[in-house]
Curated annotation (Swiss-Prot):
GO terms for biological process: asexual sporulation; sporulation resulting in formation of a cellular spore. HAMAP family: Tlp. It comes from the Bacteria. Pfam families: Tlp. Belongs to the Tlp family. The gene is tlp. Induction: Expressed only in the forespore compartment of sporulating cells. This is Small, acid-soluble spore protein Tlp. Its main location: other. Keywords: Sporulation. NCBIfam families: SASP_tlp. It is found in: Spore core. InterPro entries: SASP_thioredoxin-like. Signal peptide: none annotated.
Amino acid sequence: MNEKSYQSNPDDRSDNVEKLQDMIENTLDNIDESEAAMALSTDQEKQMIKQKNENRKMSIDAMRSEIKDEEAARKNGYTE
């Protein structure tokens, strides 16, 4: 039998803050676009959009918290 040995990738956190910031910006753009789409939506679709946007806002809060954690890790030299 062939046994393959897989090596895990090293933990590269060097650009996590930037990636999270991009994700926040993209999520904010999605909120703006979905709110614009509400003008052409049915009541049911509007309700779904509102719920999605609430979920997006919660995700943004979590990402901002993660940014704080990552910035603290940078200051501490990424020690775990």
